[in-house]
């Protein structure tokens, strides 16, 4: 293990659940507005997960008022209060970019049994 891995290991979270692309997540994000701190919920489908270690990120996509919204989060960020897996999706790809073009019921993902 080199020196960078030792430094990074101090910042790794141990409360991250196992999730994959296709899963639906509830991501509780800590939002700081001035002196106030509140929790904002972002619920959507994981369309990608990339990187490793402290640099690992995942992108969640949801449709809000007919407009697709994608947000990328660092997995080990201190601004994430918690990540909850709502349902497991059954997909055959690691990157679900094709969901960007699909609308309505076509954009649904089968639930894993």
Swiss-Prot record:
- Report keywords, A-Z: Ribonucleoprotein, Ribosomal protein
Ribonucleoprotein found in the keyword field: yes
Q: Which domain of life is it from?
A: Bacteria
Single biological process term from Gene Ontology: translation
Any one Gene Ontology MF annotation carried by this entry is: structural constituent of ribosome
How is this protein annotated for GO cellular component? cytosolic large ribosomal subunit
* General function of this protein: This protein is located at the 30S-50S ribosomal subunit interface and may play a role in the structure and function of the aminoacyl-tRNA binding site.
* NCBIfam families named in the record: rplS_bact
Q: HAMAP family per the record? A: Ribosomal_bL19
Q: Which PANTHER family match?
A: LARGE RIBOSOMAL SUBUNIT PROTEIN BL19M (PTHR15680:SF9), RIBOSOMAL PROTEIN L19 (PTHR15680)
The family line of this record is: Belongs to the bacterial ribosomal protein bL19 family.
From the Swiss-Prot or TrEMBL record, give the protein name.
Answer: Large ribosomal subunit protein bL19
